[in-house]
A protein has these predicted regions:
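Short, ordered beta-strand-loop transition motifs
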Residues: 25-33, 54, 99-104
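Hydrophobic transmembrane alpha-helix bundles
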Residues: 21-24, 36-40
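Short solvent-exposed beta->alpha transition segments
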Residues: 1-31, 111-123, 127
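Short linear motifs at secondary-structure transitions and domain/linker junctions
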Residues: 10-14, 23-27, 62-68, 83-87, ...
Length: 202
C-alpha cells in the first residue's frame, strides 16, 4: 500500500534548531515511545516520534509505524477519487450546534503537505449517534482534552488549535455524490486517540 507522508518545507531543513521545546515518554500499545517537539529559529516547530527497538534496545526515529500516513491522498479521497475507504490522521472538531441533536457532528481536518502548520482544504463532516459506543467515547475524549487530564498526546499537540482533537480514523465514502456534487462520509471506526499507533486498519 502506497503511503503518503507529510513532508517538510525545504527551508525548514536550512533553519537552525533552537532546542527542544517539549519532551515526553509514553507507551503506544505496550511499546515504549518518545515524543519530541523541537523549535527552529526561522521556521515552524517540528514533531518527532521515537520508538525503542526491541532487538537492540536502541531508541530510533520512526518513519513508518508512528508517522502520519494515509493509504491515499486526503484531498483525492474527499473528492471521490481512489478507494472508498481508508485510514487517516485527522484533527476532529466538534460542532457545538449539534449538542442539542441526536447525533454529534464533527469536522475532519487533515494535516497539509507541509506538516502540522498546514491544514487541508477539504474539511468534511461526519455524524455519530450520541448514544452509540463511539459517540460516548468521543464525548469523553473531548472532555478529557478540555480538562487536559491524561491526554494521550501531551507533547505534539502543543501548537494545535484549541478544541482540535487528534485521532486516527477509518473513514468510508459514499459511492455517489449528492446533487451538489458532494460526497458523504461515515466514521467506520475510531482507531486511535492521537496520531501514533502500531495497529493497521482491518
Amino acid at each position: 500500500m502506497v503511503k503518503h507522508y507529510a513532508v517538510t518545507k525545504p527551508e525548514v531543513m536550512l533553519s537552525r534548531p533552537a532546542g527542544p521545546k517539549k519532551f515526553a515518554l509514553l507507551e503506544v500499545e505496550g511499546h515504549p515511545c518518545a515524543q519530541l517537539l523541537i523549535a527552529f529559529t526561522d521556521s515552524p516547530d517540528m514533531e518527532f516520534c521515537f520508538f525503542k527497538d526491541e532487538k537492540d534496545g536502541l531508541w530510533k526515529l520512526d518513519w513508518q509505524q508512528f508517522a502520519r500516513y494515509q493509504p491515499q491522498s486526503w484531498e483525492d479521497f474527499v473528492r471521490g477519487k481512489g478507494e472508498g475507504i481508508g485510514e487517516f490522521r485527522v484533527w476532529m472538531i466538534r460542532d457545538r450546534m449539534s449538542e442539542s441533536r441526536d447525533d454529534y457532528a464533527y469536522r475532519l481536518i487533515a494535516p497539509g503537505m507541509n506538516g502540522t502548520n498546514d491544514r487541508s482544504i477539504a474539511r468534511p463532516m461526519v455524524y455519530v449517534p450520541k448514544k452509540s459506543d463511539m459517540g460516548k467515547r468521543l464525548f469523553m475524549l473531548f472532555k478529557m482534552d478540555e480538562e487536559m487530564l491524561h491526554s494521550p498526546y501531551k507533547v505534539l499537540n502543543a501548537n494545535d488549535d484549541r478544541g482540535a482533537l487528534r485521532v486516527r480514523v477509518l473513514l468510508s465514502r459514499s459511492k455517489e455524490p449528492n446533487r451538489k456534487g458532494e460526497y458523504s462520509f461515515t466514521l467506520v471506526k475510531l482507531l486511535g486517540e492521537g496520531w501514533y499507533g502500531l495497529s493497521a486498519a482491518k
